[in-house]
Design a protein with these regions (language model features):
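Residue-level signature of outer-membrane beta-barrel architecture
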Residues: 59-63, 103-105, 152-154, 168, ...
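Short glycine/proline- and aromatic-enriched beta-strand/turn motifs that initiate or cap beta-hairpins
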Residues: 12-76, 80-86, 177-237, 241-244, ...
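Outer membrane beta-barrel transmembrane domains
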Residues: 120-140, 144-145, 149-151, 249, ...
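N-terminal signal peptide c-region/cleavage motif recognized by signal peptidases
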Residues: 7-9
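Repeated loop/turn-to-beta-strand initiation elements of outer-membrane beta-barrel proteins
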Residues: 65-77, 109-113, 154-164, 190-195, ...
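Residues that define the transmembrane beta-barrel architecture of outer-membrane proteins
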Residues: 26, 49-57, 91-99, 140-146, ...
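Extended, hydrophobic interaction surfaces within ordered domains
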Residues: 49-53, 58, 65, 73, ...
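Sequence/structural signature of outer-membrane beta-barrel proteins
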Residues: 35-44, 80-90, 120-129, 167-173, ...
Length: 338
């Protein structure tokens, strides 16, 4: 949550250059919302409400055409990268990442509606019965996230609004969920990196430091560090990371090398959001140095401090797909151009 709050603070203090540009014109979209909901069906048991700990973070890009075809007046389309947490009902703590396509309709200068759908890769920390007793697992599944939203424009920078959202998760053989969330968002105008801070073509080196949390009981948080090399090419980037995840005292003390493909969305001339995905090969010292290939998913905010320096804050999810030892890293650091 620290990473979420830092990103939200960065947005609130972002450059005002984009304010003079009309929103909904290929600009970035950012929102954060909190709420409550309920699970049902499948493996749902015990107390099924989410205990008021539901939240979502959205980062997207608005489009006014689909496959080169202009949309009707008042309509736009948006593609969102979503981190969604379904709260804490009994024996189920599910969260994950979705890629959503949304149809957006402006009813009036004050009111805007949204409908969206897309694949949702989830990770559920739960206990299952085994011959030796109950065993805690990280259950990875692919489902669908369906969303509807109603936005009300509020005073502030252009595009700022309050957003009331409804989310439905459908997933085969396991529980489904419904939730209402309320938060604040902003549709930014079109933006490109300022000429003096365009990152393309150069090699960037840097490091981040923060904490890591193993998504299993009986562990504690640890200090974690990452060394990174990256190159940008307009909206895309390629990065390589060496991760030191830290020792949780019981299950995980991993370190290894990851490669990621990034999509970069400018928010203002000096602020951008990006999402990265790629393989992560690591050895776990608490498992006899056994080496395995995992998936590294990252969500990052970058602020250009100068032509050669960028401040970054990110959230990283390490997914093992072995039903155990998934991990979250929250990091802050710097990239330097060479």
């Amino acid at each position: 949550m620290a990473a979420v709050l830092m990103v939200h603070a960065a947005v609130a203090q972002a450059d005002t250059t984009a304010d003079t540009i009309a929103p909904d014109d290929h600009g970035a979209y950012l929102s954060v919302a909190f709420g409550n909901g309920r699970i049902y069906g499948g493996n749902a048991s015990g107390y099924r409400w989410m205990r008021g700990r539901t939240f979502e973070v959205r980062a997207g890009r608005q489009q006014d055409e689909v496959f080169g075809l202009a949309l009707p007046s008042g309509w736009t389309m948006r593609v969102d990268f979503v981190h969604y947490n379904e709260g804490h009902p009994d024996n189920n703590h599910r969260d994950g990442f979705a890629l959503q396509w949304l149809a957006v309709h402006r009813f009036s200068p004050m009111w805007t509606g949204e409908l969206g759908a897309g694949p949702y890769l989830s990770m559920n920390t739960t206990e299952i019965a085994t011959p030796t007793g109950n065993t805690q697992i990280d259950d990875a599944r692919l489902g669908v996230l369906l969303s509807a939203g109603l936005r009300l424009a509020v005073p502030g920078p252009s595009g700022t609004h309050v957003r009331l959202g409804y989310n439905h998760v459908a997933m085969h053989t396991v529980h489904r969920s419904d939730a209402l969330v309320l938060g604040i968002g902003r549709q930014f105008g079109a933006a490109e990196p300022a000429p003096d801070v365009v990152p393309d073509g150069r090699l960037w080196l840097g490091g981040t430091f923060g904490t890591s949390i193993t998504n299993m009981a009986g562990t504690h948080g640890a200090h974690a560090g990452v060394l990174e090399a990256r190159q940008y090419a307009e909206r895309w980037g390629i990065g390589y990371k060496f991760l030191f995840e830290g020792d949780d005292g019981a299950r995980v003390d991993r370190r290894g090398l990851a490669g990621q493909l990034w999509y970069v969305q400018p928010v203002t001339p000096r602020l951008s959001m990006s999402a990265g995905l790629g393989p992560y090969v690591a050895a776990n010292r608490r498992d006899g140095n056994r080496t395995a290939t995992n998936l590294l998913i990252s969500f990052q905010a970058e602020r250009a401090l100068s032509a050669r320096t960028r401040a970054i804050v990110n959230f990283n999810r390490i997914k093992t797909f072995r039903k155990t030892n998934d991990r979250d890293l929250f990091q802050i650091g710097l990239l330097r151009r060479f």
